[in-house]
């Protein structure tokens, strides 16, 4: 029974203590945005743009916040590069960077499982690459030993393997990915004023969900509550070969972060036609939509359609004579072979006749 509960804690995001959404009349718009992206992803580009446009007309601040929330969610799922074994080059080399290491369920005796050790190895390698960055380990008690937390065991492992204790930050309360995002944001913004950028480390199948929820928490707090923006600037994973988390887990976590109602069995909302704006929408949603949606292509006007046959007559297509020429040559060869020919006379000298009569 304990093992089952631990597994559920890792898979299902638990309710977290987050402030009310504060969206008021705009709350249904937020629910719609999450449902549209959950069920249609990039194909909902126009509809998502239209909903955020309506929100900005009612409340420019909230509309802009949701525009960024949806942009980042789309980017993380469609364009974000996932790095193996170590964080990428080019991240800040000072203490504005915090490396966030996602926890993983402990064994019943409180010891670290192999997958968590793999995550810590990626974290240690990345911490060596960025020697001035903070390292935040996050995770609560998931074993059977009271007081033994994922964060505590992760910190002990990093210290044992050479990382300075002064660089390690521990978040010991979270029992789900959603709680990780909420509690880490609160801890960093309240107690570590130098931090403005984060890089997330987890397993391959878990990195998309982790990044999506951390970005959503930061965008929501900065856009709605006037909080500090923690920019997601990188990631690194340990390879497990496991399939990615479902998009439904991301949608559920985002709903919890913003205190919005969520039902995973909700019927998919239908897409509706939206008049294309004069200027293209910036972001992954628009980029993918332009590639996949026929109505993003420029449609000819009625005058252009009526003038099209005349234009075709004025500029006829260039004919190719390669095939008729080849066919003619083939026919000539066949005729040359089949038509009977007269024997050709040879011009040779007359040889003297030999006399074979024996005298």
Please give the residue ranges for each predicted region.
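A structural signal for short, hydrophobic/glycine-enriched beta-strand patches
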Residues: 18-258, 303-309
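Cytoplasmic C-terminal tails of single-pass
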Residues: 344-359
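Sec-dependent signal peptide recognition
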Residues: 1-5
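Juxtamembrane/start-of-transmembrane alpha-helix segments at the extracytoplasmic/lumenal side
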Residues: 312-328
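Low-complexity, Gly/Ser/Thr/Pro-rich intrinsically disordered linker/tail segments
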Residues: 248, 253-316
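Membrane-interface motif at the C-terminal end of an N-terminal transmembrane signal
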Residues: 13-19, 340-342
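Hydrophobic core
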Residues: 6-14
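Alpha-helical transmembrane segments
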Residues: 331-343
